[in-house]
């Protein structure tokens, strides 16, 4: 049998991976790309120059392994998160990896695995079940409210009855955008009988709610807060995620992480990006203002708009969401079909990109919407 004739069915793939689909946000060259929730504002010249100089300096050490524990980077992350949340954190509370997905993978390697379970409240981030499958952690799920927000009573009941080893709560939730109040997170934590709660705050810088980091001292053995530099930080190409937790959690991850997992170049570039945090995060207010403008315009056109606390908006209600996604693409606008019947998600871009999206939406509103569509939260 020639190599090009071999299929997955011919390979000794694990049974729990057969029939599954990989993560796949389309990467297409179109005029307007609003599908992966990146910060559309490019890095400043000062940041680019700092990254280039830092990487150049680090390159002189390419013949040596990097700092295995990334102490300097974690120290900088602790300083940033302390300033951002008002919660005093040290290097012992922070861990970093190649994007928050690697953070989540390491957490599941340490606290999930064969014979253990993880639960999420769907629809939510699609990588949570994929990472669970990859670590042979049984994936459980419970439903969200009609507006896709977290139904705290359902969540507490699910955690109490099913006793998962890992609980995922995304705040703000992707793809619906709602943040979870700290009091609701406390209810979930209080209901847990062992296990850990991972609060996924990938979009935390956009949120109107306080970070779950504020609860770490009260629940040191139960709570982990994961974050990323891929969204508000405009560092998606740099691939840097991190978490805040009790020092013992970091000790647990040391048992499963691969040695030297963060390259010397990644560490240098991320530290440079953190030095420009104030400048980069200055775009957050502008993106929030654009989010509100886009939401208001979609509502005016008759779309059902889910109120968002992130840098994206979930909207509908379409007769055939996949077909409507294609019509946006035909108009030169790439948005995201996240698999929720009747709904699509759009990333908030630059004003001109949002205008192009809205222009396409105005054309489609008369033909694509369900007759019963009524905007959520409309006055």
Swiss-Prot record:
Catalytic activity: L-histidinol phosphate + 2-oxoglutarate = 3-(imidazol-4-yl)-2-oxopropyl phosphate + L-glutamate
EC number: 2.6.1.9
Transferase found in the keyword field: yes
Gene Ontology terms describing biological process: L-histidine biosynthetic process
N6-(pyridoxal phosphate)lysine sites (modified residues): 231
GO molecular function ontology, one term from the record: histidinol-phosphate transaminase activity
Pathway(s) of this molecule: Amino-acid biosynthesis; L-histidine biosynthesis; L-histidine from 5-phospho-alpha-D-ribose 1-diphosphate: step 7/9
UniProt keyword annotations, A-Z: Amino-acid biosynthesis, Aminotransferase, Histidine biosynthesis, Pyridoxal phosphate, Transferase
Domain of life assignment: Bacteria
Transmembrane helix in keyword set: no
Required cofactor names: pyridoxal 5'-phosphate
Subunit structure: Homodimer.
Protein family: Belongs to the class-II pyridoxal-phosphate-dependent aminotransferase family. Histidinol-phosphate aminotransferase subfamily.
PANTHER family the record matches: HISTIDINOL-PHOSPHATE AMINOTRANSFERASE (PTHR42885:SF2), HISTIDINOL-PHOSPHATE AMINOTRANSFERASE-RELATED (PTHR42885)
Record protein name field: Histidinol-phosphate aminotransferase
Taxon lineage: Bacteria, Bacillati, Actinomycetota, Actinomycetes, Mycobacteriales
Protein encoded by which gene: hisC
């Amino acid at each position: 049998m020639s190599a090009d004739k071999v299929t997955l069915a011919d390979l000794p793939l694990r049974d729990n991976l057969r029939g599954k689909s990989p993560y796949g946000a389309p990467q297409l060259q179109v005029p307007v790309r609003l599908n992966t929730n990146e910060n559309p504002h490019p890095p400043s010249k000062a940041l680019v120059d700092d990254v280039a100089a830092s990487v150049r300096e680090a390159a002189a050490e390419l013949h040596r392994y990097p700092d295995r524990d990334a102490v300097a980077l974690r120290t900088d992350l602790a300083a940033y998160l302390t300033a951002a949340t008002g919660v005093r954190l040290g290097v012992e509370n922070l861990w970093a990896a190649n994007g928050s997905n690697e953070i989540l993978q390491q957490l599941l390697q340490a606290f999930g695995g064969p014979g253990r379970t993880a639960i999420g409240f769907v629809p939510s981030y699609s990588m949570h079940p994929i990472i669970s499958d990859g670590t042979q952690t049984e994936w459980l799920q419970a439903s969200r409210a009609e507006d896709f927000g977290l139904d705290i009573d359902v969540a507490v009941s699910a955690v109490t009855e099913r006793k998962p080893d890992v609980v995922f709560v995304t705040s703000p939730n992707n793809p619906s955008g709602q943040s979870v109040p700290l009091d609701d997170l406390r209810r979930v934590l209080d209901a847990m009988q062992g296990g850990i709660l991972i609060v996924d705050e990938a979009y935390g810088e956009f949120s109107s709610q306080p970070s779950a980091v504020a609860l770490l001292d009260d629940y040191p053995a139960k709570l982990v807060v994961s974050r990323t530099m891929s969204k508000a930080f405009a560092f998606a190409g740099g691939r840097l995620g991190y978490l805040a937790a009790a020092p013992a959690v970091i000790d647990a991850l040391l048992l499963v992480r691969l040695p030297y997992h963060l390259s010397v170049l990644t560490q240098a570039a991320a530290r440079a990006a953190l030095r420009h945090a104030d400048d980069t995060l200055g775009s957050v207010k502008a993106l929030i203002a654009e989010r509100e403008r886009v939401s208001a315009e979609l509502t005016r056109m008759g779309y059902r708009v889910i109120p968002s606390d992130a840098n994206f908006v979930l909207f509908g209600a379409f007769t055939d969401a996949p077909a409507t996604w294609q019509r946006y693409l035909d108009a030169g606008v790439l948005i995201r079909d996240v698999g929720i019947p009747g709904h699509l998600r759009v990333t908030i871009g630059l004003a001109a990109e949002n205008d192009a999206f809205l222009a396409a939406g105005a054309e489609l509103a008369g033909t694509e919407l369900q007759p019963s569509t009524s905007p959520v939260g409309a006055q």
